[in-house]
Amino acid sequence: IVRHRWPLFAAMSVLAIALGAGVSQIDLDDRFGEYLDNRYEFRRDTDFVAAHLTGLDSIEHALPAGGPGRVADVEYLRALDGLGDWYRAQPGVVYVASLAEMSKRLNQARHGEDPDFYRLPEIGAAALLGEYAAAAPADVARALVDESFSTSRLGVIVGDHSSRQLRHLAAGADAWLASNAPQYAAPATGLALMYAHVSGRNIEAMLISTAAALVLISALLIFALRSPFLGLLSLLPNLAPAVIALGLWGWLVGDLGLAVGDS
């Protein structure tokens, strides 16, 4: 080994660089539904629901109409309809529920289920919604509107989305509202979105803490060896195994998120 140290050093350097380049392939993201593996019944059940029934994640908007009874305004319903259409055009969106959709269905039902009337009513929307609220059970009638009819809920069910994709989808919806209906804008919310933001902040904190640890280790080595050159040089053999391992993970797997063990 000593006799052939330079060829070995060159070969190991090339191998380390090639494997370490896989770090660039790592996607720092995760999926809440994949925190547990298939040994757990919860994971098997959620996989079945996602594959055969519906999505597991949802995004909600509580959109103010500007005052009591204003949810029946045509302009407001058009804004809801536009936001719903934007969501449906996004990949992975399974279902959108809003007062605009209910109004179109009620308008169609009023006209004998004629498909041509599956549209927002130009007039009489308030009376239409009032009839529905009076006839439907209280919990059903309040599923999309509040008691004063001043705010309505728009709900979105999405399929297999990662935390980053959920954040991106919600940010796009907020941007659409800010551009097209700022008077009715309300930020996207929801339990899935909350976990998506927690995931993003955890990843940011992990990267910052790793960089801070590297700086502190470098400073300690420089102080211990009393040489900036030797201190920085000594980082190479200490960091190389970690970089190679992460690079190999990047080439073979690609995703790096939260890992959950049996403990």
Model-derived features: positions:
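Extracytoplasmic
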Residues: 1, 5-263
